[in-house]
Amino acid sequence: MKKVLLACFLGLGTQMAAVAGPSHSHDHNHATDHKAMHGGLFYQAAYDYELLIKDGQALLFVTDHGKPVSLSGATAKLTILEGSKRTDIVLSPSGESLSAKTTIKPSAGAKAVVQLRVGGKSSTAKFTF
């Protein structure tokens, strides 16, 4: 009787493992799926974000599946953290990006966070230089 029960449990366990299938680990930051179109840092969340700090300007490009998002009326704040130093920059709509003049030149390892409000929705993007 014990052998029959053991065989039933083993058979049931094998069937359950087959139904469950292989595990699938999934990272929802698809930064490796896309490339930055302007040479900046890329982050994907509610939208695709590209942050570029170059030539005295901070630029944030926002796209949705490769198509530019209308940034009319959008507001954004860029926070850059370098060690204990914190710099906040307000970004304003400018054509197909949000931008601001800046003198900051983040070093490797500095962190950046963008808080964006566009079309009544808020989202956050994080970057590492």
Predicted regions and their residues:
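Intrinsically disordered, low-complexity terminal tails/loops enriched in metal-binding residues
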Residues: 2-129
